[in-house]
UniProtKB/Swiss-Prot annotation:
The family this protein is said to belong to: Belongs to the transferase hexapeptide repeat family. LpxD subfamily.
Keyword Repeat listed: yes
Organism of origin: Psychromonas ingrahamii (strain DSM 17664 / CCUG 51855 / 37)
Protein's UniProt name: UDP-3-O-acylglucosamine N-acyltransferase
Phylogenetic lineage: Bacteria, Pseudomonadati, Pseudomonadota, Gammaproteobacteria, Alteromonadales
Protein keywords: Acyltransferase, Lipid A biosynthesis, Lipid biosynthesis, Lipid metabolism, Repeat, Transferase
GO cellular component, one term: membrane
Keyword Lipid biosynthesis: yes
GO biological process: lipid A biosynthetic process
Annotated function: Catalyzes the N-acylation of UDP-3-O-acylglucosamine using 3-hydroxyacyl-ACP as the acyl donor. Is involved in the biosynthesis of lipid A, a phosphorylated glycolipid that anchors the lipopolysaccharide to the outer membrane of the cell.
Length: 340
């Protein structure tokens, strides 16, 4: 695919400086860009290295209009420009609407217009598939589930019964949505399984990463609001509620019945306790453990950064002595007070 720089400027709503007829063939990184490529700069440190870049054009911040003489598109946020360019130059396969002969579709399922259903897909009774959906190989969609229009489900994903997906959702490979939550009642040294009779309801424009699991609710539903982005290998337990446009990075776990607000960012490998609430506009940095509710917006951390093993062992040894040191300091303070 080929676009000239003027066309790209129009699609990005960017200010063009340079040759509007210049042909652009690819989007590339700053370091590897060559002639015919366009790149972007969102890292301020790279602004001092523009003479090292071999790209035919660069997306730059508006604040740098006086600092570059080559072909450029100027935007308030070049990273947004990168996102839009990635959409333009996207090479993800886009299969033509068709239903494979090997697909197993219940006679009572409702299939919309221009739908792709690939090999060995199973669509059970009462399922409703919206227009322009793409369902890849080996996907299973359980009874009475619904898919909004323009939703894409990648191979080997499983949607249990009564799962609801909104419009324009993306479900990546091996994701499992609507499996049983971890509900068991202790009884005389054993466990009684509690059937999970809620469901999972997912809004519009949600993306669920590969091998992520979202459990169905016990009594109430597990709710994922519009625009939520959940990375790979995350666990979202039963009855959890995640607010609009919150993003959760890979390997994070959210325990049951926790409510996460809107526009939050949860870093990788974060563990969030159950039955707590996190308000809107909270950032939790990677490897943190959230044990109590967060009631004020802000950035929260609890992870321990890596250090050399010898230093870490020394720090840990000191940590084990904190209680004893605290008692000694209190005793010294009392002694000092008594002597004055």
């Amino acid at each position: 695919m080929v676009y000239n720089l003027g066309q790209l400027a129009q699609q990005l709503n960017a200010q063009l400086v340079g040759d509007a007829e210049l042909n652009i063939y690819r989007l590339a990184t700053f370091e590897k860009a060559a002639q015919g490529d366009i790149t972007f700069v969102s890292d301020k440190n790279l602004l001092t290295r523009l003479d090292e870049c071999n790209a035919s054009a660069i997306v730059l911040p508006n604040s740098f209009k006086q600092g570059y003489q080559g072909n450029a598109l100027f935007m308030e946020t070049p990273y947004v420009g990168y996102a839009l360019l990635a959409r333009i130059f996207d090479t993800t396969p886009n299969p033509q609407p068709a239903i494979a002969a090997s697909a197993q579709i219940h006679k009572n399922a409702i299939i919309g217009q221009n739908v792709t259903i690939a090999h060995n897909v199973v669509i059970e009774e009462g399922v409703v598939i919206g227009d322009n959906c793409q369902i890849m190989d080996n996907v299973v969609i359980g009874q009475y589930s619904t898919l909004g229009e323009n939703t894409r489900i990648y191979p080997n994903a499983t949607l249990y019964h009564q799962t609801e997906l909104g419009k324009r959702c993306i479900i990546h490979a091996n994701a499992v949505i609507g499996s049983d939550g971890f509900g068991n009642a202790p009884y005389q040294g054993t466990w009684i399984k509690i059937p999970q009779i809620g469901k999972v309801i997912i809004g519009d424009d949600v993306e669920i990463g590969a091998s992520t699991t979202i459990d169905r609710g016990g009594l109430s539903d597990t709710l994922i609001a519009n625009g939520v982005k959940i990375d790979n290998q995350c666990q979202i337990a039963h009855n959890v509620s995640i607010g609009a446009h919150t993003a959760i990075a890979g390997g994070s776990n959210v325990a049951g019945s926790t409510k996460i607000g809107s526009n939050c960012i949860v870093g990788g490998c974060v563990a969030i306790n159950g039955h707590i609430t996190i308000v809107d506009n909270v950032v939790v940095t990677g490897d943190s453990m959230v044990m109590r509710s967060i009631t004020e917006p802000g950035i929260y951390s609890s992870g321990v950064p890596a250090q050399k093993n010898k230093a870490w062992r020394k720090t840990t040894a000191h940590t084990l002595k904190i209680d004893d040191l605290f008692k000694r300091v209190k005793a010294l303070e009392k002694q000092l007070k008594d002597n004055t």
